[in-house]
Amino acid sequence: MNLGLAIFLIIIALLIGLVGGFYGARAYMKKYFQDNPPISEDMIAAMMAQMGQKPSTKKLNQVMNMMKHQQQK
């Protein structure tokens, strides 16, 4: 097999793999976020209410900031 042809086919295969991997990962993440949406302030307020706490705006902001800080680590 010609060396130039082999290199060309390897590069084409890599490009096809990159594009396929990108779209596969994108579809997986879309499905994941549909099945498991990120937690929102409303969900935190509902959890606090179920635990018997009054969900004030200050408490909600504190919890959201703590969660954002944990995600950045």
Swiss-Prot record:
Belongs to the UPF0154 family. It is a single-pass membrane protein. Keywords: Cell membrane, Membrane, Transmembrane, Transmembrane helix. Signal peptide: none annotated. Pfam families: UPF0154 (PF03672). GO terms for cellular component: plasma membrane. It comes from Lactobacillus gasseri (strain ATCC 33323 / DSM 20243 / BCRC 14619 / CIP 102991 / JCM 1131 / KCTC 3163 / NCIMB 11718 / NCTC 13722 / AM63). It is found in: Cell membrane. The chain crosses the membrane at residues 3-23. This is UPF0154 protein LGAS_0795. It comes from the Bacteria.
